[in-house]
């Protein structure tokens, strides 16, 4: 038995209860239309008691279905056309909303059916002990997180709110008329709702309903504007903003507070002495109670300016004035304009003392609260003085201050610091990674003492594989232990414990990660857990850099010890969730050949049950395999990559090959690569199934020479595969998008090896791209050439040759390869004029080239019809040049503008 089959057998034994589809004889090749219909897992949930699991399966186009399973893996129920799904707090019910069928909706749209005549959603309340209730004509619903109650509205024109227990005991159902908004408290069955009232019984205003007692309380009467209605965690206190005059809310919002279900009282309003002069309560500022509910945080702002209604808009010039020395690029200002108009500055109301303290302002606008708002000090910061340099650095410096929540007094901690300060859970320390020296630091919030936790000589905190002309990033942190006693920091492989006061030596808690080249990372199973309990066993996920496989490990981090392997192998583990009250978990396991089906187990992973059977979708189709390969680059570096071979691979045959890549992807060897009509890349399964080999090589870069780095890494990898004898060297294509699109465009100027290239959203002119704008954020593009992905390490005037040598445009006359470009006119990442420069140059040179522009789409197609179209055209393009299939009409004759609304040219 060869090693390929040994590995496959080991995988099957590891996974356990697998469907035998992989052993079945498949005969059909995938089509693009098949990709659209194949289902993926788009959601999953486990009940708090660990007895039930729900999983949502969804095609890329069409209706989703939610399946319900018990602890033995038996499918109990199926809910077609499913959307949202939630288990109740008691684990006795599953609540599922259902949408109308897509085919029905589409047919009604074709008939131009009016909106009020279109079908509505439904709500299914399914009892896990048997029985179900269906609520038709659903408009919206909320399920209480900590109580078995649901609130909903139904009917397009009816705004009645219905609140009922999930047991369908309608004798305890409540109704409220003309409801505008409603929600449950996070950890109780308390519900608020805002109603316009009716003439009979219900006055307009804000009400509180205690579902446990049935008591309804009018918290605030009024038909004005209610905003930011917020419970504390337990639902005992309720805060909100209110404005009686709807047309003056921008300046007349007031803050109200209800305690223990009592009618609300106004606690802050315009003109409060604690506010800066001319400031008001912001309707956009988020309300937030501290954990103890002793503090209420809210937002203030300068009174918003109002437009001059006496001046006609047509009489006002619509000019933008860009200034060379303004800190924030005008395009960024314009992009963020609506956000800035809604900006608020945090203040706090001390509930017990009835005092207000303004914490943030226009000079120091960013704030971090410690201990969920209960710490005595918060962290204030601003990057405004340094915004200009971030335009080309890609990073920003900040000033940091402590601020007292009692009196608002401030103390400077650091100026012009590149570190991104964060707060420990209880707010005792600020901590950060300093990119400039690759070290971790803490700072005591109480006395301002700064401590250096790591040095480059003692701890490799940084990304050891950094290959951009900038400071390397950190590997991050696992979190803080209880009482802020220790900070757990990752290096490339292990988890280390550090004393935040730097009085004790650091401890490598996992010990063997670097030795075994396994990268250990803590798995957070409890979303509500703020700190790490070192005395409890912890689940770690490990990535093996040698095999590229994953594993789960058990560790007690109270002492240094090698983690205990629970399961590990040649697969990828993802999407783990734990039941709240038991040690049951659900997770997915996958490889390129193995669908990421959902599994159910306990935390020891001794027995795992496969719940879903998504792999059954593969049984009729030819499915490829993935293999790790290695070679030496032209500049002497060992590289890895993945070769994806057809299911019926025969080493004696010659296969067409597509090289598809970005930067480094060998670590995704066991990624299933869910079949789909991708927005930017080929679908590996589609091409494997149709007789293509796909090669995804790792690229490692030298500063200043990204194009040549790509050439030096990729070409010997391709040569290595050609040398194996099964590649048709006259039928090799290349495909990449964005950064990958740039690289394949560059390669076409350096070699005529490729018979066809698809280049998506490429940069071909580094000079003009440097001066462009990322319209999706307003940012200038200069930083990415000087410091990040484009890797030129200088400006066009300091290193002009680098810009020239790395720009495909200036050697386009050397291109001998037909090119398909995809670049959309609403691209917010790469200016689409780059695609135009590429196309115009190729057209001028008389070289075969086609360009796809999905009008109104961003960096890649997002509309499903456009993604399908892109995949079909790219598939036809490669099939023509690599498999000698007939040229489709859109390539041979084009699609003239006057024909475009009617013809696709397939």
For every predicted segment, state its role.
Residues 1-27, 763, 772:
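Bacterial Sec-dependent N-terminal signal peptides
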Residues 16, 23-584, 590-596, 600-601, ...:
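Beta-propeller folds
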Residues 221-222, 310-311, 359-362, 393, ...:
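Composition- and surface-driven signal marking solvent-exposed, interaction-prone regions
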Residues 294, 656, 755:
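Conserved acidic residues
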Residues 357, 379, 599, 629, ...:
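Hydrophobic/aromatic beta-strand patches that form the interior of the parallel beta-sheet core
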Residues 383, 543, 590, 660-664, ...:
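Glycine-rich His-Gly loop
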Residues 456-468, 605, 613-731, 735-737:
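Cap/lid segment of the alpha/beta-hydrolase catalytic domain
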Residues 674-906:
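Active-site-proximal cap/loop segments of hydrolase catalytic domains
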């Amino acid at each position: 038995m060869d090693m390929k089959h040994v590995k496959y057998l080991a995988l099957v034994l590891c996974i356990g209860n697998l469907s035998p589809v992989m052993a079945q004889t498949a005969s059909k090749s995938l089509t693009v239309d098949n990709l659209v219909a194949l289902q993926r897992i788009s959601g999953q949930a486990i009940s708090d008691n660990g007895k039930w699991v729900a999983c949502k399966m969804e095609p890329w186009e069409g209706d989703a279905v939610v399946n319900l399973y018990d602890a033995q893996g038996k499918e109990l129920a199926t809910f077609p056309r499913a959307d949202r799904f939630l288990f109740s707090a008691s684990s006795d019910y599953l609540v599922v909303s259902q949408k109308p069928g897509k085919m029905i909706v589409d047919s009604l749209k074709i008939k131009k059916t009016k909106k009020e005549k279109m079908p509505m959603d439904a709500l299914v309340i399914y009892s896990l002990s048997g029985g179900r209730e269906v609520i038709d004509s659903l408009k919206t619903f909320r399920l209480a997180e900590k109580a078995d109650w649901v609130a909903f509205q139904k009917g397009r024109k009816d705004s009645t709110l219905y609140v009922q227990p999930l047991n369908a005991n309608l004798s305890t159902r409540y109704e409220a008329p003309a409801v505008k908004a409603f929600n449950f408290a996070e950890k109780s069955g308390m519900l608020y709702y805002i109603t316009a009232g009716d003439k009979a019984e219900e006055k307009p205003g804000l009400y509180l309903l205690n579902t446990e007692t049935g008591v309804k309380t009018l918290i605030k009467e009024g038909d004005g504007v209610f905003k930011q209605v917020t419970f504390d965690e337990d639902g005992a206190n309720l805060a909100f903003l209110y404005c009686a005059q709807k047309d003056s809310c921008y300046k007349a919002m007031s803050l109200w507070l209800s305690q223990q279900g009592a009618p609300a009282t106004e606690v802050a309003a315009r003109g409060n002495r604690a506010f800066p002069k001319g400031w008001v309560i912001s309707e956009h500022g988020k309300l937030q109670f501290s954990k103890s509910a002793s503090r209420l945080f809210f937002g203030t702002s300068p009174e918003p300016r109002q437009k001059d209604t006496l001046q006609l808009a047509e009489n006002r010039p619509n000019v933008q004035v860009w200034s060379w020395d303004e800190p924030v690029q005008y395009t960024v200002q314009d992009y963020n304009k609506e956000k800035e108009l809604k900006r608020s500055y945090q203040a706090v109301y001390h509930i017990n003392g009835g005092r207000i303290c303004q914490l943030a302002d226009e000079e120091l606008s960013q704030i971090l609260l410690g201990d969920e708002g209960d710490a005595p000090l918060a962290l204030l910061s601003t990057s405004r003085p340094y915004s200009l340099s971030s335009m080309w650095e890609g990073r920003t410096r900040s000033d940091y201050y402590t601020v007292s929540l009692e009196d608002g007094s401030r103390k400077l901690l650091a100026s012009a610091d590149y570190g991104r300060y964060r707060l420990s859970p209880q707010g005792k320390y600020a901590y950060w990674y300093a990119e400039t020296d690759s070290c971790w630091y803490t700072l005591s919030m109480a006395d301002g003492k700064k401590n250096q936790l790591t040095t480059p000589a003692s701890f490799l905190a940084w990304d050891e594989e950094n290959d951009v002309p900038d400071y390397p990033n950190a590997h991050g942190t696992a979190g803080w232990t209880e009482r802020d006693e220790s900070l757990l920091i990752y290096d490339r492989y292990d988890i280390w414990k550090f004393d935040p006061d730097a009085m004790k030596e650091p401890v490598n808690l996992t010990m063997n990660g670097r030795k075994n080249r396994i990268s250990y990372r803590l798995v957070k199973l409890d979303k509500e857990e703020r700190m790490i309990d070192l005395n409890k066993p912890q689940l770690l996920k490990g990535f093996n850099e040698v095999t590229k496989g994953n594993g789960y490990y058990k560790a007690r981090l109270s002492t240094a010890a090698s983690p205990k392997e629970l399961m590990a192998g040649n697969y990828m583990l993802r999407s783990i969730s734990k039941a709240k009250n038991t040690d049951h978990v659900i997770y997915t396991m996958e490889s390129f050949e193995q669908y990421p089906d959902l599994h159910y187990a306990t935390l020891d992973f001794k027995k795992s049950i496969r719940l879903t059977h998504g792999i059954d979708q593969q049984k009729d189709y030819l499915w490829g395999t993935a293999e790790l390969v290695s070679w030496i680059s032209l500049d002497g570096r060992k590289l890895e990559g993945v070769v994806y071979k057809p299911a019926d691979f025969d080493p004696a045959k010659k296969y067409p090959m597509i090289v598809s890549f970005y930067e480094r992807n060998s670590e995704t060897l066991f990624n299933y690569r869910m079949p789909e009509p991708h927005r930017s890349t080929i679908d590996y399964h589609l091409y494997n199934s149709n007789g293509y080999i796909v090669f995804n090589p790792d690229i490692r870069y030298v500063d200043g020479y990204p194009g040549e780095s790509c050439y030096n890494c990729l070409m010997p990898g391709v040569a290595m595969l050609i040398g194996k004898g099964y590649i048709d060297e006259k039928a090799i294509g290349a495909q990449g998008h964005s950064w990958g699109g740039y690289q394949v465009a560059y390669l076409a100027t350096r070699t005529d090896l490729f018979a066809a290239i698809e280049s998506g959203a490429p940069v071909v002119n580094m000079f003009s791209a440097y001066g462009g704008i990322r319209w999706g954020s307003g940012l200038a593009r200069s930083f990415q050439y000087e410091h990040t992905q484009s890797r030129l390490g200088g400006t066009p005037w300091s290193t002009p040759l680098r810009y020239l040598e790395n720009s495909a445009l200036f050697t386009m006359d050397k291109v001998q390869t037909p090119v398909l470009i995809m670049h959309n006119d609403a691209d917010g990442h790469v200016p689409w004029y780059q695609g135009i420069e590429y196309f115009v140059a190729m057209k001028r040179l008389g070289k075969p080239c086609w360009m796809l522009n999905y009008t109104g789409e961003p960096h890649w197609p997002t509309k499903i019809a456009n993604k399908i179209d892109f995949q079909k055209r790219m598939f036809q393009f490669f099939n023509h040049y690599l498999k000698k299939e007939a040229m489709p009409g859109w390539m041979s004759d084009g699609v003239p503008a006057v024909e475009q609304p009617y013809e696709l040219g397939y």
